[in-house]
UniProtKB/Swiss-Prot annotation:
InterPro entries assigned: SAICAR_synt/ADE2_N, SAICAR_synt_PurC, SAICAR_synth, SAICAR_synthetase, SAICAR_synthetase_CS
GO term, biological process aspect, one: 'de novo' IMP biosynthetic process
Protein name: Phosphoribosylaminoimidazole-succinocarboxamide synthase
Annotated NCBIfam families: purC (TIGR00081)
SUPFAM superfamilies (UniProt xref): SAICAR synthase-like
GO molecular function: ATP binding; phosphoribosylaminoimidazolesuccinocarboxamide synthase activity
């Protein structure tokens, strides 16, 4: 097995099975496109366990994804895909960048989920792009754009259902997709408090990486509490 890719939060390794990869979650935490970063022991374990539970839940709710199984506390086995260079963001409630970009008041609830595309390009700081940009860049065609948006909305509905069971609100989240050798689009990467904004329904307390971004609490304790809530649903 050899290292195929290393990002801010994960390492990806080849395996001895064609078409399958081993993903290892790291104890690194970053914010602001890496401007702020720290090592937090146990963070990788938490995100791996959370993502494994959520992807298994999505599988049972008919969302096609790359997850095969959890291998260890920090590792999982996934189907190999070619990652589409888009961060697909779904917003249910206004907060973060959209309040600065478009003037929405924090906490404003959108009548319908808003889906946005961000071009995965570190040197460009992952800019917001339109459907036409996606086509001009050769990232996806009209049919694929339609499919990505629908899959994102379907994921949103399933995650809202899951969060409701934990008395939490899904504010927004970002996901990534990839294509199999046969061209099928699958949900990939991770879904965790690193990639979602999650608020307590009663207190609006954050259960996500904003506690690190804004220095409002312990990231490890927050993620552990979220994992405990997930495990209590089993």
């Amino acid at each position: 097995m050899s290292l195929l890719y290393e990002g801010k939060a994960k390492r990806v390794f080849t395996t001895n099975i064609d078409g399958q990869l081993r993903v290892e979650y790291k104890d690194e935490v970053t914010a602001g496109n890496g401007a702020k970063k720290d090592t937090m022991i146990g963070k990788g374990k938490l995100n791996n366990q959370i993502t494994s539970i959520i992807f298994d839940y999505l599988t049972h709710n008919h969302i096609d994804n790359h997850f095969i199984k959890q291998l260890s506390q920090t590792e999982q086995l996934v189907q190999q895909v070619d990652i589409i260079p888009l961060e697909v963001v779904v917003r249910n409630i206004a907060t973060g960048s959209i309040t600065k970009r478009l003037g929405f008041k924090k906490g404003h609830t959108f009548e319908e989920p808003l889906v946005e595309f961000f071009y995965k390009k570190d040197e460009l700081n992952d800019p917001l792009i339109t459907d036409d940009h996606v086509k001009l860049l050769g990232i996806a065609n009209d049919e694929e754009i339609k499919q990505l948006k629908q899959m994102a909305k379907d994921i949103n509905q399933v995650l809202i259902q899951l969060m409701n069971e934990m008395s939490l609100r899904l504010v927004d989240f970002k996901v990534e997709f990839g294509k199999t050798n046969g061209g099928k689009i699958l949900l990939a990467d991770e879904i965790s408090p690193d990639t979602c904004r999650i608020w307590d329904k009663n207190t609006d307390t954050n259960f996500d990486k904003d506690v690190y971004r804004n220095n409002t609490g312990s990231l490890i304790e927050t993620y552990q509490t979220f994992l405990n809530k997930l495990e209590d649903l089993k």
